[in-house]
């Protein structure tokens, strides 16, 4: 549906977007995820037609809409846009906001407005003014207004960031269902890893203007391509390893990995939930509990290993630990990275032996 080829945007000597290519399929949801200043909003604006690319092209249904010789105006691209400030017209009622971009007779407009108000579960607010409704309600109305002209694509730039935590979670689920119901493709820009993972079919991870990884939420989380990606998406423990004889030596013992991989490995990455922690028997301890954080459904403990390294371990809250408990830590799920921080394929699981 939408394709970007080698897209770039420069502001003088500053490169905001560098050589990015992507393809969005019909009805697909993707998130552009990255830290502040990585170029994700600029990329969205290039797709929307709000910025002209310095290089590269944007195609819609195989027709060029941005490039050296053409720049189709935003209003002719027929994309819906939703921003974090909701951007409702303050002088128009809820129903007039929704009807603003709808073509057709008065009765056709009214029918579409009522259809969308029902879809976002707010038919009772038709006559209200924007200042008379809550932030969550304003965001639902913004979604309804974006959907009203039946757009090809919805572009969302940090749409939930101004809402409190619980409302943000609920609204994210609701809006995803609404957009799926309408069958419209969606691009979400966010710096929130949880938002990207829970909202999207696919995540595009950006850093310093570049696309560093693309994949399903599960692929991005379970198989990060770099150490940076492993830390930016989820919690990660990074531990030093060294090849010795015929195995990879770690704080948990010897790891059985292929020799070619083991000789290149310098860092072991383990997710907090992939550790197994047990009370240590005499002489078996390889760590001491230093901190305990209880958050209801999850207990996270900080463990100082015999190697001097500190790790975070998460698990069930039913077995409570206390500081200075002696523990045995093991893992059978890990990834290996080289000295440059790149993942080594072929080193992703195994067992440790003393």
Language model features with spans:
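Pre-Walker A (P-loop) beta-loop-beta motif of ABC nucleotide-binding domains
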Residues: 20-31, 89
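Conserved coupling/switch loops of ABC nucleotide-binding domains, chiefly the family-specific signature
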Residues: 54-57, 208
């Amino acid at each position: 549906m939408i394709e970007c080829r080698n897209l770039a945007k420069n502001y003088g000597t500053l490169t905001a977007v560098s050589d990015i290519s992507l393809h969005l399929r019909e009805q697909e949801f993707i998130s552009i995820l990255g830290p502040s200043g990585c170029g994700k909003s600029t990329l969205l604006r290039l797709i929307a037609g709000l910025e002209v690319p310095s290089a590269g092209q944007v195609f819609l249904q195989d027709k060029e809409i941005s490039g050296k010789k053409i720049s189709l105006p935003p209003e002719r691209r027929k994309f819906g846009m939703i921003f974090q400030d909701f951007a409702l017209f303050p002088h128009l009622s809820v129903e007039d906001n929704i009807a603003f971009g709808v073509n057709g007779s008065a009765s056709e407009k009214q029918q579409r407005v009522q259809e969308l108000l029902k879809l976002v579960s707010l038919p009772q607010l038709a006559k209200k003014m924007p200042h008379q409704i809550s932030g969550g309600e304003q965001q639902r109305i913004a979604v309804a207004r974006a959907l009203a002209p039946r757009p090809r694509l919805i572009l969302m730039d940090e749409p939930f960031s101004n809402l409190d935590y619980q409302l943000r979670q609920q609204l994210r689920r609701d809006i995803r269902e609404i957009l799926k119901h309408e069958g419209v493709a969606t691009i979400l820009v966010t710096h929130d890893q949880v938002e990207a993972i829970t909202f999207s079919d696919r995540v595009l991870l950006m850093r310093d203007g570049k696309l560093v990884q693309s994949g399903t939420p599960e692929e991005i989380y379970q198989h990060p391509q770099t150490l940076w990606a492993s830390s930016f998406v989820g919690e990660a423990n990074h531990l030093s390893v060294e090849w010795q004889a015929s195995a990879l030596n770690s704080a948990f013992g010897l790891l059985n990995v292929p020799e070619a991989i083991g000789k290149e490995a310098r860092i072991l990455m383990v997710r907090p939930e992939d550790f197994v922690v047990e009370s240590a028997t005499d002489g078996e301890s390889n760590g001491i509990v230093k901190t305990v954080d209880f958050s209801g459904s999850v207990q996270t403990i900080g463990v100082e290993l015999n190697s001097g390294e500190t790790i975070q371990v998460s698990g069930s809250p039913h077995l409570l630990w206390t500081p200075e408990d002696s523990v045995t830590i093991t893992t059978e799920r890990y990834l290996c990275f080289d000295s440059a921080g790149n993942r080594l394929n072929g080193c992703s699981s195994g067992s440790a032996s003393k």
